[in-house]
Amino acid sequence: MDDYTQSINDAVKCLRQGGVIAYPTEAVYGLGCDPFNHDAVAQLLTIKKRSIKKGFILIASEWKQVEPLTEPIDPKALARVFDTWPGPFTWTFPASKEAPHWITGQHSTIAIRVTAHPLAKLLCQRFAGPLISSSANQEGEPPIRDVKILRLVFGNKIDKTLEGPLGPTHRPTPIRDAITGEILRL
């Protein structure tokens, strides 16, 4: 990861200044920002042409980065979630009052993934918190896996691009309900 130190530091600086970045994830390039910066989230919504009602997925390097945003759930259900993390699995949890409405959208839940992607994980570690992780595409378009296409589609709308290898998965991560285990998206 030493090859990426400066790029990650630049991306973290951009995030702290309220910027929107692109970065590699388990499956596709993601667009993200500081989930607690309303202006940054509004900019991301504009870039993606996405409704605030849909909400966003958060990625984290570890559970403790996102735990305050969730209500407690049954320990057995939580153990089932932890069995899949870190990894390419997103789970929805009951949102706590700490979770901003612009993250949850019209939902009473919050979608979370503890990532195993080395660069995304390091990005969350250096940022010292979770990030919004939304596939790099505009509403209704396929997610982007190639940095050249990313630049062509988004141009200077994105403040910083962290280039790096994508994970081995070719589809966005599945989403499951943390309480019931129900599959919400495959």
From Swiss-Prot:
One of its GO terms (cellular component) is cytoplasm. Residues 5-186 form the YrdC-like domain. It comes from the Bacteria. GO terms for molecular function: ATP binding; double-stranded RNA binding; L-threonylcarbamoyladenylate synthase; tRNA binding. Its EC number is 2.7.7.87. Keywords: ATP-binding, Cytoplasm, Nucleotide-binding, Nucleotidyltransferase, Transferase, tRNA processing. It holds the Pfam family Sua5_yciO_yrdC. One of its GO terms (biological process) is regulation of translational fidelity. It catalyses: L-threonine + hydrogencarbonate + ATP = L-threonylcarbamoyladenylate + diphosphate + H2O. It is found in: Cytoplasm. Its main location: cytoplasm. Required for the formation of a threonylcarbamoyl group on adenosine at position 37 (t(6)A37) in tRNAs that read codons beginning with adenine. Catalyzes the conversion of L-threonine, HCO(3)(-)/CO(2) and ATP to give threonylcarbamoyl-AMP (TC-AMP) as the acyladenylate intermediate, with the release of diphosphate. Belongs to the SUA5 family. TsaC subfamily. This is Threonylcarbamoyl-AMP synthase. It comes from Coxiella burnetii (strain RSA 331 / Henzerling II).
